């Protein structure tokens, strides 16, 4: 039995994570096509490790949700979350993982938008930042459409396909967020 959605758009629902969610997250995490440009998933994760990771996300400094397409309520296609929430400086890191099987249908963009609305409206954060591979054109375009802008790069920070690539740092401030 799945929980009710916490946040919902016309394409995606953000569902509270359950301790048993490693069952659906592990195959997505271990899919090389899904994690091609990510830090997560570069090495396989066993189910027990996945369960421990999900348990570690249940803390006052993290808000992580499973992603379900609206038309397939019982299906999970990834996660989105705010990590390292700093309650003094009012900031957090945003991370998202969407199964490669559902790329290109707007789930990632809408989940990002819903998470930003949650961060700025409910948590009253001032800043949300992220990092992504400079060669991940799809993610860069999605984040820019949601209002993130590049703040800088960690040069030759990530090893991909036989060479080092830059890690792009992007951020958005509460005052800049327009609900994308």
Residue map of PLM features:
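Acyl-donor (CoA/ACP) binding surface of acyl/acetyltransferases
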Residues: 1-22, 27-31, 71-180
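Short helix-loop boundary/capping segments at the starts of domains
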Residues: 31-34, 59
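Conserved GNAT-fold acetyl-CoA-binding loop/helix
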Residues: 33-54
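A general structural signal for well-ordered secondary-structure junctions
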Residues: 34-35, 63, 125
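Sparse recognition of residues in long alpha-helices and their boundaries
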Residues: 41-42, 66, 159
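A short helix-loop-beta-strand connector motif used in the catalytic cores of GNAT acetyltransferases and
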Residues: 54-66
């Amino acid at each position: 039995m799945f929980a009710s959605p916490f946040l919902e758009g016309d394409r995606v629902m953000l569902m509270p994570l359950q301790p048993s969610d490693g069952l659906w997250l592990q195959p997505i995490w271990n899919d090389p096509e899904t994690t091609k440009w990510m830090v997560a998933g570069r090495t396989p994760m066993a189910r027990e490790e996945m369960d421990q990771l999900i348990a570690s996300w249940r803390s006052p400094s993290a808000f992580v949700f499973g992603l379900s397409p609206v038309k397939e309520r019982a299906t999970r296609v990834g996660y989105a979350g705010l990590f390292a929430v700093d309650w003094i400086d009012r900031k957090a890191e945003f991370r998202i993982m969407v199964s490669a099987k559902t790329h290109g249908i707007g789930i990632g963009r809408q989940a990002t938008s819903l998470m930003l609305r949650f961060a700025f409206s409910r948590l009253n954060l001032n800043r949300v930042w992220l990092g992504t591979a400079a060669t991940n054109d799809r993610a860069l375009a999605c984040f820019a459409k949601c209002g993130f802008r590049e703040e800088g790069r960690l040069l030759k920070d990530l090893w991909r396909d036989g060479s080092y690539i830059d890690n792009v740092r992007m951020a958005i401030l509460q005052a800049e967020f327009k609900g994308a």
